[in-house]
């Protein structure tokens, strides 16, 4: 699913910047605040899923930790397949895009 949409890299960049921008939310412009809110909403939606906490651990490992691991390595830590890990990551990016207003589920 990578780069299927023109906005895909933009959504990934929004997700990567989320922890830093969350701390300075009041000083951000309107668009940056919308970006932070989109990621926060996607996190909330993901947490409500049955396997949401595992999905959030995956997202944290992929985007927000300094120790970079391969998708296969992260999947092994979570006891899921690499394909499932890739699907969860893609679903999270789509969720952020939906919360931001760039994607509509059909």
Language-model-detected regions and their locations in the chain:
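N-terminal interaction/assembly modules
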Residues: 1-49, 84, 100-106
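Residue-level detector of well-ordered alpha-helical segments, enriched
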Residues: 10, 54-58, 88
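Amphipathic alpha-helical core segments of compact helical bundles
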Residues: 44, 63-68, 93, 97
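Short amphipathic alpha helix immediately N-terminal
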Residues: 50-69
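Helix-turn-helix DNA-binding module
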Residues: 66-81
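DNA major-groove recognition helices of helix-turn-helix
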Residues: 85-99
């Amino acid at each position: 699913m990578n780069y299927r949409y023109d906005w895909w890299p933009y959504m990934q960049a929004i997700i990567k910047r989320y922890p830093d921008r969350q701390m300075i939310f009041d000083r951000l412009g309107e668009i940056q605040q919308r970006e932070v809110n989109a990621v926060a909403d996607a996190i909330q939606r993901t947490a409500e899923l049955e396997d949401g906490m595992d999905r959030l651990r995956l997202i944290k490992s992929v985007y927000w930790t300094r120790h970079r691991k391969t998708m296969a390595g992260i999947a092994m830590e979570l006891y899921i397949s690499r394909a499932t890990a890739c699907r969860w990551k893609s679903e999270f990016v789509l969720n952020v895009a939906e919360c931001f207003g760039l994607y509509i589920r059909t």
